[in-house]
Protein backbone atom coordinates (compact mmCIF):
# COMPACT_ATOMS: atom_id res chain seq x y z
CA UNK A 1 0.00 0.00 0.00
CA UNK A 2 1.02 3.63 -0.56
CA UNK A 3 0.33 5.88 2.44
CA UNK A 4 -2.57 3.62 3.39
CA UNK A 5 -3.96 3.64 -0.16
CA UNK A 6 -4.40 0.44 -2.17
CA UNK A 7 -1.97 -0.14 -5.03
CA UNK A 8 -3.00 -0.68 -8.63
CA UNK A 9 0.35 -2.22 -9.44
CA UNK A 10 3.36 -3.29 -7.38
CA UNK A 11 6.80 -4.62 -8.13
CA UNK A 12 9.55 -6.17 -6.05
CA UNK A 13 13.24 -6.69 -6.82
CA UNK A 14 12.83 -5.68 -10.47
CA UNK A 15 16.20 -5.94 -12.20
CA UNK A 16 17.34 -5.66 -15.80
CA UNK A 17 20.85 -5.09 -17.19
CA UNK A 18 22.00 -3.51 -20.46
CA UNK A 19 25.79 -3.50 -20.51
CA UNK A 20 26.84 -1.04 -17.82
CA UNK A 21 23.26 0.10 -17.17
CA UNK A 22 21.30 -1.65 -14.45
CA UNK A 23 17.64 -1.20 -13.59
CA UNK A 24 17.34 -1.98 -9.89
CA UNK A 25 14.03 -1.35 -8.15
CA UNK A 26 13.60 -3.13 -4.80
CA UNK A 27 10.02 -1.91 -4.41
CA UNK A 28 7.52 -0.23 -6.71
CA UNK A 29 4.09 1.01 -5.69
CA UNK A 30 1.62 2.73 -8.03
CA UNK A 31 -1.37 3.96 -5.99
CA UNK A 32 -4.85 3.08 -7.17
CA UNK A 33 -7.13 5.89 -8.27
CA UNK A 34 -4.44 8.44 -9.09
CA UNK A 35 -2.26 9.74 -11.93
CA UNK A 36 1.38 8.88 -11.25
CA UNK A 37 4.19 10.58 -13.19
CA UNK A 38 7.49 8.81 -13.84
CA UNK A 39 10.22 11.44 -14.16
CA UNK A 40 13.92 11.19 -14.93
CA UNK A 41 16.54 12.23 -17.44
CA UNK A 42 17.16 10.34 -20.67
CA UNK A 43 18.55 6.89 -19.96
CA UNK A 44 17.23 6.75 -16.41
CA UNK A 45 15.30 3.55 -17.16
CA UNK A 46 11.76 4.88 -17.53
CA UNK A 47 10.94 3.18 -20.84
CA UNK A 48 12.54 -0.08 -19.70
CA UNK A 49 10.39 -0.08 -16.56
CA UNK A 50 7.20 0.71 -18.48
CA UNK A 51 7.95 -2.03 -21.01
CA UNK A 52 8.38 -4.52 -18.17
CA UNK A 53 5.12 -3.47 -16.55
CA UNK A 54 3.29 -3.62 -19.90
CA UNK A 55 4.60 -7.09 -20.68
CA UNK A 56 6.67 -5.90 -23.64
CA UNK A 57 9.83 -7.13 -21.93
CA UNK A 58 9.94 -10.46 -20.13
CA UNK A 59 13.71 -10.78 -19.78
CA UNK A 60 13.94 -9.33 -16.29
CA UNK A 61 14.26 -10.54 -12.74
CA UNK A 62 11.74 -9.82 -10.02
CA UNK A 63 8.00 -9.84 -9.63
CA UNK A 64 5.15 -7.60 -10.77
CA UNK A 65 1.67 -7.81 -9.27
CA UNK A 66 -1.36 -6.39 -11.04
CA UNK A 67 -4.41 -5.33 -9.02
CA UNK A 68 -3.10 -7.02 -5.85
CA UNK A 69 -2.89 -10.34 -7.72
CA UNK A 70 0.23 -12.39 -8.30
CA UNK A 71 -0.30 -12.66 -12.00
CA UNK A 72 1.44 -12.34 -15.34
CA UNK A 73 0.10 -9.79 -17.78
CA UNK A 74 -0.78 -12.62 -20.18
CA UNK A 75 -3.03 -14.28 -17.59
CA UNK A 76 -6.75 -14.34 -18.29
CA UNK A 77 -8.37 -10.96 -17.82
CA UNK A 78 -5.22 -9.04 -16.86
CA UNK A 79 -4.23 -7.82 -20.32
CA UNK A 80 -7.75 -6.55 -21.00
CA UNK A 81 -7.54 -4.30 -17.96
CA UNK A 82 -4.30 -2.59 -18.98
CA UNK A 83 -3.88 0.05 -21.67
CA UNK A 84 -0.41 0.81 -23.01
CA UNK A 85 1.12 3.36 -25.36
CA UNK A 86 4.73 3.12 -26.48
CA UNK A 87 6.94 5.95 -27.60
CA UNK A 88 7.24 4.63 -31.17
CA UNK A 89 6.30 1.83 -33.58
CA UNK A 90 2.85 1.49 -32.03
CA UNK A 91 1.23 0.88 -35.45
CA UNK A 92 2.63 -0.71 -38.59
CA UNK A 93 3.46 2.10 -40.99
CA UNK A 94 1.14 0.92 -43.78
CA UNK A 95 -1.99 0.61 -41.63
CA UNK A 96 -4.86 2.96 -42.32
CA UNK A 97 -7.18 4.44 -39.72
CA UNK A 98 -9.82 1.83 -40.55
CA UNK A 99 -7.30 -0.97 -40.02
CA UNK A 100 -6.30 0.50 -36.66
CA UNK A 101 -9.95 0.48 -35.60
CA UNK A 102 -10.55 -3.06 -36.89
CA UNK A 103 -7.41 -4.58 -35.37
CA UNK A 104 -7.95 -2.91 -32.00
CA UNK A 105 -11.40 -4.48 -31.93
CA UNK A 106 -9.95 -7.91 -32.69
CA UNK A 107 -7.22 -7.62 -30.07
CA UNK A 108 -9.24 -6.21 -27.19
CA UNK A 109 -12.76 -7.17 -26.13
CA UNK A 110 -13.21 -3.84 -24.35
CA UNK A 111 -12.45 -1.69 -27.40
CA UNK A 112 -15.37 0.59 -28.38
CA UNK A 113 -15.18 1.59 -32.08
CA UNK A 114 -17.83 4.28 -31.69
CA UNK A 115 -15.92 5.86 -28.84
CA UNK A 116 -12.75 5.60 -30.91
CA UNK A 117 -14.37 7.49 -33.80
CA UNK A 118 -15.71 10.15 -31.44
CA UNK A 119 -12.29 10.69 -29.86
CA UNK A 120 -10.63 10.92 -33.29
CA UNK A 121 -13.17 13.54 -34.32
CA UNK A 122 -12.82 15.49 -31.07
CA UNK A 123 -9.03 15.55 -31.42
CA UNK A 124 -9.27 16.61 -35.08
CA UNK A 125 -7.16 13.71 -36.29
CA UNK A 126 -6.54 13.88 -40.04
CA UNK A 127 -9.62 12.23 -41.59
CA UNK A 128 -7.70 11.26 -44.74
CA UNK A 129 -6.48 8.07 -43.00
CA UNK A 130 -10.06 6.77 -42.85
CA UNK A 131 -12.37 5.40 -45.53
CA UNK A 132 -11.86 3.22 -48.60
CA UNK A 133 -9.04 5.42 -49.87
CA UNK A 134 -7.55 6.00 -46.44
CA UNK A 135 -3.90 6.96 -46.28
CA UNK A 136 -1.32 5.12 -44.21
CA UNK A 137 -0.84 6.32 -40.65
CA UNK A 138 2.84 6.92 -41.51
CA UNK A 139 1.63 10.05 -43.33
CA UNK A 140 0.53 11.60 -40.04
CA UNK A 141 2.64 14.12 -38.18
CA UNK A 142 4.17 12.97 -34.90
CA UNK A 143 1.53 14.90 -33.00
CA UNK A 144 -1.39 13.44 -34.94
CA UNK A 145 0.08 9.95 -34.69
CA UNK A 146 0.19 10.27 -30.89
CA UNK A 147 -3.41 11.51 -30.94
CA UNK A 148 -4.36 8.33 -32.82
CA UNK A 149 -2.48 6.20 -30.28
CA UNK A 150 -4.29 7.96 -27.44
CA UNK A 151 -7.66 7.56 -29.18
CA UNK A 152 -7.02 3.83 -29.43
CA UNK A 153 -6.11 3.34 -25.77
CA UNK A 154 -8.79 5.67 -24.36
CA UNK A 155 -11.44 3.85 -26.43
CA UNK A 156 -10.83 0.69 -24.41
CA UNK A 157 -12.44 -0.28 -21.10
CA UNK A 158 -9.39 -0.58 -18.85
CA UNK A 159 -8.42 -0.10 -15.21
CA UNK A 160 -4.88 1.22 -15.61
CA UNK A 161 -3.07 3.10 -18.37
CA UNK A 162 0.69 2.80 -18.86
CA UNK A 163 1.76 5.71 -21.08
CA UNK A 164 5.34 6.21 -22.25
CA UNK A 165 6.00 9.90 -22.97
CA UNK A 166 2.49 10.62 -24.27
CA UNK A 167 2.99 14.41 -24.07
CA UNK A 168 6.30 14.69 -25.94
CA UNK A 169 5.03 15.04 -29.54
CA UNK A 170 1.98 17.10 -28.55
CA UNK A 171 1.56 20.87 -28.74
CA UNK A 172 0.77 22.83 -25.54
CA UNK A 173 -2.99 22.83 -26.17
CA UNK A 174 -3.09 19.09 -26.78
CA UNK A 175 -1.01 18.48 -23.66
CA UNK A 176 -3.63 20.37 -21.70
CA UNK A 177 -6.37 18.29 -23.34
CA UNK A 178 -4.44 15.11 -22.53
CA UNK A 179 -4.49 16.19 -18.88
CA UNK A 180 -8.27 16.61 -19.15
CA UNK A 181 -8.59 13.17 -20.74
CA UNK A 182 -6.62 11.61 -17.89
CA UNK A 183 -8.83 13.37 -15.33
CA UNK A 184 -11.98 12.12 -17.07
CA UNK A 185 -10.60 8.59 -17.27
CA UNK A 186 -9.88 8.58 -13.53
CA UNK A 187 -13.26 10.11 -12.69
CA UNK A 188 -15.10 7.43 -14.67
CA UNK A 189 -13.39 4.79 -12.55
CA UNK A 190 -14.70 6.13 -9.23
CA UNK A 191 -11.34 5.63 -7.56
CA UNK A 192 -10.58 2.28 -9.20
CA UNK A 193 -8.76 3.49 -12.30
CA UNK A 194 -5.11 4.54 -12.36
CA UNK A 195 -2.66 6.14 -14.79
CA UNK A 196 1.13 5.72 -14.83
CA UNK A 197 2.90 7.92 -17.38
CA UNK A 198 6.48 8.97 -18.04
CA UNK A 199 7.18 12.56 -19.00
CA UNK A 200 9.86 15.17 -19.58
CA UNK A 201 7.15 17.82 -19.87
CA UNK A 202 6.83 18.23 -16.12
CA UNK A 203 5.39 21.75 -16.09
CA UNK A 204 2.68 20.95 -18.65
CA UNK A 205 1.64 17.74 -16.88
CA UNK A 206 1.94 18.91 -13.27
CA UNK A 207 -1.73 19.85 -12.99
CA UNK A 208 -2.81 16.23 -13.52
CA UNK A 209 -0.01 14.59 -11.51
CA UNK A 210 -1.07 13.26 -8.11
CA UNK A 211 1.90 11.04 -7.30
CA UNK A 212 5.46 11.25 -8.58
CA UNK A 213 8.28 8.73 -8.94
CA UNK A 214 11.73 10.11 -9.76
CA UNK A 215 14.30 7.80 -11.37
CA UNK A 216 18.01 8.26 -11.94
CA UNK A 217 20.47 5.70 -13.30
CA UNK A 218 17.98 2.85 -12.99
CA UNK A 219 17.00 3.60 -9.40
CA UNK A 220 14.07 5.32 -7.72
CA UNK A 221 15.60 8.27 -5.88
CA UNK A 222 12.42 10.00 -4.65
CA UNK A 223 8.69 9.41 -4.67
CA UNK A 224 5.53 10.62 -3.02
CA UNK A 225 2.28 12.48 -3.47
CA UNK A 226 2.97 15.88 -5.02
CA UNK A 227 1.33 17.70 -2.11
CA UNK A 228 3.68 15.91 0.29
CA UNK A 229 6.76 16.64 -1.83
CA UNK A 230 5.85 20.32 -1.86
CA UNK A 231 5.85 20.24 1.93
CA UNK A 232 9.12 18.31 2.10
CA UNK A 233 11.02 20.74 -0.15
CA UNK A 234 11.11 24.55 -0.18
CA UNK A 235 12.16 27.14 -2.76
CA UNK A 236 14.60 29.68 -1.30
CA UNK A 237 15.35 33.07 -2.88
CA UNK A 238 17.80 35.71 -1.69
CA UNK A 239 20.16 38.57 -2.52
CA UNK A 240 23.66 37.99 -3.87
CA UNK A 241 25.20 38.90 -0.49
CA UNK A 242 23.80 35.67 0.96
CA UNK A 243 24.58 33.42 -2.00
CA UNK A 244 27.65 31.62 -0.68
CA UNK A 245 26.24 31.10 2.82
CA UNK A 246 22.96 29.79 1.43
CA UNK A 247 24.64 27.58 -1.16
CA UNK A 248 25.92 25.32 1.64
CA UNK A 249 22.33 24.64 2.74
CA UNK A 250 20.74 24.18 -0.68
CA UNK A 251 20.37 20.97 -2.65
CA UNK A 252 20.85 23.03 -5.81
CA UNK A 253 21.62 26.70 -6.33
CA UNK A 254 21.34 29.00 -9.32
CA UNK A 255 22.98 32.38 -8.90
CA UNK A 256 23.47 35.54 -10.96
CA UNK A 257 24.56 39.13 -10.36
CA UNK A 258 21.29 39.92 -8.58
CA UNK A 259 20.88 36.98 -6.24
CA UNK A 260 20.14 33.29 -6.04
CA UNK A 261 17.41 30.70 -5.81
CA UNK A 262 17.48 27.03 -4.99
CA UNK A 263 15.74 24.09 -3.41
CA UNK A 264 16.25 23.06 0.20
CA UNK A 265 14.64 20.62 2.59
CA UNK A 266 11.81 22.34 4.44
CA UNK A 267 13.14 20.94 7.70
CA UNK A 268 16.25 23.12 7.21
CA UNK A 269 14.37 26.42 6.98
CA UNK A 270 15.55 27.57 10.42
CA UNK A 271 19.17 27.25 9.26
CA UNK A 272 18.62 30.28 7.01
CA UNK A 273 18.01 32.49 10.06
CA UNK A 274 19.86 35.78 9.77
CA UNK A 275 19.84 35.74 5.97
CA UNK A 276 17.62 37.97 3.86
CA UNK A 277 15.74 35.20 2.07
CA UNK A 278 12.22 34.40 0.94
CA UNK A 279 10.57 30.99 1.06
CA UNK A 280 8.09 29.82 -1.58
CA UNK A 281 6.34 26.58 -2.47
CA UNK A 282 8.31 24.99 -5.32
CA UNK A 283 6.76 23.59 -8.47
CA UNK A 284 7.07 19.91 -9.28
CA UNK A 285 9.44 20.91 -12.07
CA UNK A 286 11.74 22.71 -9.63
CA UNK A 287 11.71 19.80 -7.18
CA UNK A 288 12.36 17.26 -9.95
CA UNK A 289 15.28 19.16 -11.48
CA UNK A 290 16.86 19.67 -8.05
CA UNK A 291 16.68 15.95 -7.28
CA UNK A 292 17.95 15.01 -10.74
CA UNK A 293 20.89 17.39 -10.34
CA UNK A 294 21.70 15.69 -7.03
CA UNK A 295 21.85 12.27 -8.67
CA UNK A 296 23.02 12.84 -12.23
CA UNK A 297 26.40 11.94 -13.68
CA UNK A 298 26.18 14.99 -15.97
CA UNK A 299 28.48 17.94 -15.37
CA UNK A 300 28.18 21.49 -16.66
CA UNK A 301 30.50 21.95 -19.66
CA UNK A 302 32.62 25.06 -20.05
CA UNK A 303 31.01 27.38 -22.58
CA UNK A 304 33.62 29.75 -23.99
Which residues make up each language-model segment?
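Catalytic Walker B motif of ABC-type/P-loop ATPase nucleotide-binding domains
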Residues: 161-165
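Helix-to-loop junction immediately C-terminal to a conserved catalytic motif
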Residues: 54
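Conserved ABC transporter NBD signature motif
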Residues: 62-78
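C-terminal coupling/interaction segments
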Residues: 251-304
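A short, flexible loop at the N-terminus of ABC-type nucleotide-binding domains that lies
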Residues: 1-27, 32-34
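ABC-family P-loop ATPase nucleotide-binding domains
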Residues: 86-148
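The feature captures the beta-strand-to-loop junction immediately N-terminal to the Walker
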Residues: 39-41
Amino acid sequence: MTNGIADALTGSNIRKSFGKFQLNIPELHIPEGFATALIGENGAGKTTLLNILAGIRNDYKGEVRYFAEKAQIVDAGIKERIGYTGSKNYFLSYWTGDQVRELAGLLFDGFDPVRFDNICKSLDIDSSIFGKTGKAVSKLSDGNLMKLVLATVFARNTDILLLDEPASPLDPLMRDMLSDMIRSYLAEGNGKRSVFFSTHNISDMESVTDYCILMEQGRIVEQGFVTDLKEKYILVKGDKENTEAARKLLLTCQANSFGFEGIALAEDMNRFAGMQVEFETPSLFQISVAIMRQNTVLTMPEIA
